[in-house]
């Protein structure tokens, strides 16, 4: 008698393959944590000048020798570091080199951001987010993500570096993709450390800017713009975009900010911007937009936003609905680089 094969009752080989795949997915958290520990200990930097023994690495990092050896042996099996197989030596390879400290590398900065204990605690409470639709960060850490990054300089630095590395790449893409030549003034709302504003001002010498950001980060933006020789063309405005937005600019920019907030807060922000806009002002929303077949990486970021801050990535239709509630409308949407980021040009309705 032949047993019918179904998704619940596959053949033996198919079942074994399915179990192996699921097991590999389940072990993903362990692999990530192992990488984080190697990064925290500074192993990639120590291997930059050549292979070293586990004994030497343990001495340099203050780690337990045998346990560090076990950690590196595991990571070598997934392609991070090379186990040379003789003399207890481990070496750098293409994957581990990506983890070297580099403010321009989204992977290197994100590896350090993800390693933070408060980040891991938030993911432990994912069930809370799925049940309630709210951020789990607050429940896991006893404070909000925004409060933590405001009060804790180390947390703020980890976050700003992670965001800054992404912005370094995207800033030039925005300046290349959108023509600001018809504008005299631009306001960057939640402009971070200033890389976007710097790129736009560099590309369009006739433009003057204002950057609105929370006080601790606003000073970092001032330093960057001063270092780029742009301080005389950009006012730094420390403040809260829920409270105040400068009136009457030709162009307003807001990049990777709206996805940090739930729908009600997005409408609050957009209404505040709409009030500040002139009848002929343009608002550029630069953000990930989910299309019909989004990449897994986009959907992971979507879930990360939920866990950390209760935010979300949105589709064009979802975003358009929020704009309508805010008295705004989409004029057009432009690609920005090869990924899911779009520049959405918006006018008052």
Curated annotation (Swiss-Prot):
Q: What class of enzyme is it?
A: transferase
* Keywords, sorted A to Z: Methyltransferase, S-adenosyl-L-methionine, Transferase
Where in the chain are disulfide-linked cysteines found? Answer: none
- Alphabetical list of Pfam families matching this protein: Dimerisation, Methyltransf_2
Q: What does the record list as GO biological process? A: methylation; quinone biosynthetic process
Q: GO molecular function terms here?
A: methyltransferase activity; O-methyltransferase activity; protein dimerization activity
Q: Does the keyword Translocase apply?
A: no
- Source domain of life is Bacteria
**Binding-site list for S-adenosyl-L-methionine:** 167, 190, 213-214, 240-241, 255
User: EC no.?
Assistant: 2.1.1.316
| Residues reported in the UniProt entry to bind substrate | 288
Catalytic residue list: 259 (proton acceptor)
Q: What happens when the gene is disrupted?
A: Cells lacking this gene are unable to produce mitomycins A and B, and accumulate 6-demethylmitomycin A and 6-demethylmitomycin B.
Q: Which reaction does it catalyse?
A: 6-demethylmitomycin A + S-adenosyl-L-methionine = mitomycin A + S-adenosyl-L-homocysteine; 6-demethylmitomycin B + S-adenosyl-L-methionine = mitomycin B + S-adenosyl-L-homocysteine
Q: How is its activity regulated?
A: Completely inhibited by Zn(2+) and Cu(2+).
Membership in a protein family:
Belongs to the class I-like SAM-binding methyltransferase superfamily. Cation-independent O-methyltransferase family. COMT subfamily.
What does the UniProt record say this protein does?
Involved in the biosynthesis of the quinone methoxy group present in the mitomycin A and B, which are used as anticancer agents. In vitro, catalyzes the 6-O-methylation of both C9-beta- and C9-alpha-configured 6-hydroxymitomycins via the transfer of the S-methyl group of S-adenosyl-L-methionine (AdoMet) to the 6-demethylmitomycin A and B. It can also use hydroxyquinone as substrate.
How does this protein assemble?
Homodimer.
Name under which the protein is recorded: Mitomycin biosynthesis 6-O-methyltransferase
